[in-house]
Amino acid sequence: MTQLEYALSGIVTKEMKIVAEYEGVDEEFILEGVKKGEIVIPSNINHKNLIPKGIGRGLSTKVNANIGTSDAYPEIEKEIEKLNVAVKAGADAVMDLSTGGDINQSCRKILENSPVPVGTVPMYQAAVESISKYGSIVAMPEEFIFEVIEEQAKDGVDFITVHCGLTFESLKKLKDNGRVMDIVSRGGSFTIAWMLHNNKENPLYKHFDRLLDIAKKYDITLSLGDGLRPGCLEDATDAAQIQELIILGELVKKSREAGVQVMVEGPGHVPIDQIEANVKLQKQLCHNAPFYVLGPIVTDIAPGYDHITSAIGGAIAAASGADFLCYVTPAEHLGLPDKEDVKEGVIAAKIAAHAADIAKGVKGAKEKDLTMARARKALNWDEQIKLSIDPDKAFKYRVNKNISTAKTCSMCGKFCAMKIVSEYLGTSTMTC
């Protein structure tokens, strides 16, 4: 049985109990959320070392880190290093997006070493292997994508991105209305190329019931991908994007009816003034399924700083109701991220998630900031560093920018605002 089927039967699973304890909520709250499909717990029955996390309404906003090999950098060991960095920095999930080297081995190694849920985009492996087996991506037999999905499911993958909403109907909207950047999703581009070359409907849509059978067998959470997500601000919230979203909403209902957990992916590049509307629209069209967003990136002019542009968008999206943020690293649009990029991306996304949780009233979020404020008032440097979202960086700044015995910071010194005011108010502080 899947987590959803257990919930529908009124059974609180071990995974639900772990999520409830982590979130500080009642088990019944998690049970009801999973039952309604508003909370998912990605947890493949074969991922043995998994510490499950819940994603969805009423829970803390979660962060995903993308890792994986490329044709230029096929070394699996480096991706394991990135995995460890991501988890240490606070990633709640990782996705293996490998396209280089031994993709099967990469996924298995990441699963062996990951305590957090692991996701994939099976079309990546199917496309890469189709080139060697059949000569091209478009020569791939329909059967092959399902063979890859089944193989990854057996290995223990917890959630998979599947671009099931890319149909001839949604493609027509793209052709009729035009775009600056057409399609920027790799999985989406592979799928569209296959469809147009073979003049056949997307097999993941056409044979969605078969996909559901595999997902149900292993309790894989489907992450319905946005193959028509906008790749620049100019393309945001257009007819093609919305048409795909409508189709995904229909597939959400089918997934739930089959007892399969499901969430929905979203944009992309979106102007700040359109982010809230995008989230509200997804929640309405997709029946309050958990919403997993890439960023969104709020300006196209900041390569090298897209961890910042995405954190801005992510905070707004999550505050508006998005549940799961996919990080963006400083290397986005420029190259494969290294482990430092991974850390920067996770931290930026965690800041966005936490800021949104304060706005949403997530249990315990605001209290963290109050605890930090009290530590600052008390000049408790050790506590401030401990409470920081990146304690290592906070410690380095404290040590490198100040004399080791100083009670002051080098910014204010004897002109500390808190010290001066506390002397006249009679409140207890030493210096800032």
From Swiss-Prot:
Its cofactor is [4Fe-4S] cluster. It catalyses: 5-amino-1-(5-phospho-beta-D-ribosyl)imidazole + S-adenosyl-L-methionine = 4-amino-2-methyl-5-(phosphooxymethyl)pyrimidine + CO + 5'-deoxyadenosine + formate + L-methionine + 3 H(+). GO terms for molecular function: 4 iron, 4 sulfur cluster binding; carbon-carbon lyase activity; zinc ion binding. Binds 1 [4Fe-4S] cluster per subunit. The cluster is coordinated with 3 cysteines and an exchangeable S-adenosyl-L-methionine. Keywords: 4Fe-4S, Iron, Iron-sulfur, Lyase, Metal-binding, S-adenosyl-L-methionine, Thiamine biosynthesis, Zinc. InterPro entries: ThiC, ThiC/Bza_core_dom, ThiC/BzaA/B. Substrate binds at N66, M95, Y124, H163, S185, R186, G187, D226, G227, L228, R229, E265, Y292. Zn(2+) binds at H269, H333. One of its GO terms (biological process) is thiamine biosynthetic process. [4Fe-4S] cluster binds at C409, C412, C416. Its EC number is 4.1.99.17. Pathway: Cofactor biosynthesis; thiamine diphosphate biosynthesis. Belongs to the ThiC family. PANTHER family: PHOSPHOMETHYLPYRIMIDINE SYNTHASE, CHLOROPLASTIC, THIAMINE BIOSYNTHESIS PROTEIN THIC. Catalyzes the synthesis of the hydroxymethylpyrimidine phosphate (HMP-P) moiety of thiamine from aminoimidazole ribotide (AIR) in a radical S-adenosyl-L-methionine (SAM)-dependent reaction. NCBIfam families: PRK13352.1, thiC. This is Phosphomethylpyrimidine synthase.
